[in-house]
From Swiss-Prot:
One of its GO terms (cellular component) is cytoplasm. This is L-lactate dehydrogenase 1. It catalyses: (S)-lactate + NAD(+) = pyruvate + NADH + H(+). HAMAP family: Lactate_dehydrog (MF_00488). The gene is ldh1. The keyword Kinase does not apply. Its EC number is 1.1.1.27. The lineage of its organism: Bacteria, Bacillati, Bacillota, Bacilli, Bacillales. It comes from Bacillus cereus (strain ATCC 14579 / DSM 31 / CCUG 7414 / JCM 2152 / NBRC 15305 / NCIMB 9373 / NCTC 2599 / NRRL B-3711). One of its GO terms (biological process) is lactate metabolic process. The modification Phosphotyrosine is found at residue 223. It is found in: Cytoplasm.
Amino acid sequence: MKKGINRVVLVGTGAVGCSYAYCMINQAVAEEFVLVDVNEAKAEGEAMDLSHAVPFAPAPTRVWKGSYEDCKDADLVVITAGLPQKPGETRLDLVEKNAKIFKQIVRSIMDSGFDGIFLIATNPVDILTYVTWKESGLPKERVIGSGTTLDSARFRYMLGEYFDIGPHNIHAYIIGEHGDTELPVWSHVSVGIQKLQTLLEKDNTYNQEDLDKIFINVRDAAYHIIERKGATYYGIGMSLLRVTKAILNDENSVLTVSAYLEGQYGQKDVYIGVPAVLNRGGVREILEVELSEDEELKFDHSVQVLKETMAPVL
């Protein structure tokens, strides 16, 4: 790693990976950006195309098609490789197929001498982040999954539409599995500086029934998009960019990534979406917010589902 030069390696140049790559070049987040794919011609073509966008970016980025050897000097390796989710298929259905692929990828990366941070996006992301941690031998703080960052963004966007407030001023989180057992933390939602419950009590224009429908749309958003266009990639591309910036810029920002629990929320030995402080070292700390009794039960269920699904592939 050259002094003052950030290098990010992307493994997987499918729709998600390339959406992330375009975001990275567009915002000039790193000085060096390397694309790695089993289809080397595809990776080379994407690198060429992205390079031609560099003159329009706010700062130059050197982009090239590389190999696992380029991970040796990387600050961050982002993995989006793997089989995509098909219509009607849950994220957990992918576990055995993608776990096998991941073990090979992670071993190849570690053989290069990589000693940076992993950011995982491939589904089922919580389980594959755990697999990456186990295979890599890196500290848990430096293996991170995209978790429920996208779900939380969808949640804020849809709540913003409902309340006619910009999503940046909606403070709301989805936690748990990035999938069917995720849950909204209603007890900590605020619109601007006003708590959600206070707003509901003051204005009967809004009601919990509508809010419950919003969450269902958040939870099932990927299914709706996949039915219509075959895959989701813009939202997750921006989510990965946001996590990348939090890490490389040493922001100490709070994002709901997939992080390793060792007692927080009463759970151990699982990667799952929770609010965490991210900086140059990875996960600085996990923020343990007080959940309602119902939220606790749903979170515990989410953990249990992940552990049961994960057991056969470890």
